Amino acid sequence: VIGGDECNINEHPFLVLVYY
């Protein structure tokens, strides 16, 4: 989850921006 995967973008786009 804490990696910024494409699947994570679909579920939590905000978290992706933070972890990227």
UniProtKB/Swiss-Prot annotation:
GO BP annotations, alphabetical order: proteolysis
Record keywords, A-Z: Disulfide bond, Fibrinogenolytic toxin, Fibrinolytic toxin, Hemostasis impairing toxin, Hydrolase, Protease, Secreted, Serine protease, Toxin
Gene Ontology molecular function: serine-type peptidase activity; toxin activity
Compartments reported by the entry: Secreted
Record-level GO cellular component terms: extracellular region
Tissue expression notes: Expressed by the venom gland.
Domain Peptidase S1 positions: 1-20
Regulation: Inhibited by PMSF and soybean trypsin inhibitor. Partially inhibited by DTT and cysteine. Not affected by EDTA.
EC primary class: hydrolase
EC number, as in UniProt: 3.4.21.-
Family the UniProt entry places it in: Belongs to the peptidase S1 family. Snake venom subfamily.
Entry function: Fibrin(ogen)olytic serine protease degrades Bbeta-chain of human fibrinogen (FGB) and shows a lower activity on Aa-chain (FGA). Also degrades fibrin directly. Releases fibrinopeptide B and a small amount of fibrinopeptide A. Has also be shown to catalyze the hydrolysis of some chromogenic substrates such as S2238, S2160, S2302 and S2251.
Note: Negative results: does not show coagulant activity. Does not show activity on gamma-chain of fibrinogen. Does not activate Lys-plasminogen. Does not show hemorrhagic activity. Neither causes rabbit platelet aggregation nor inhibits platelet aggregation induced by ADP and collagen.
Self-association state and partner proteins as the record states: Monomer.
Protein name, as recorded: Beta-fibrinogenase jerdofibrase
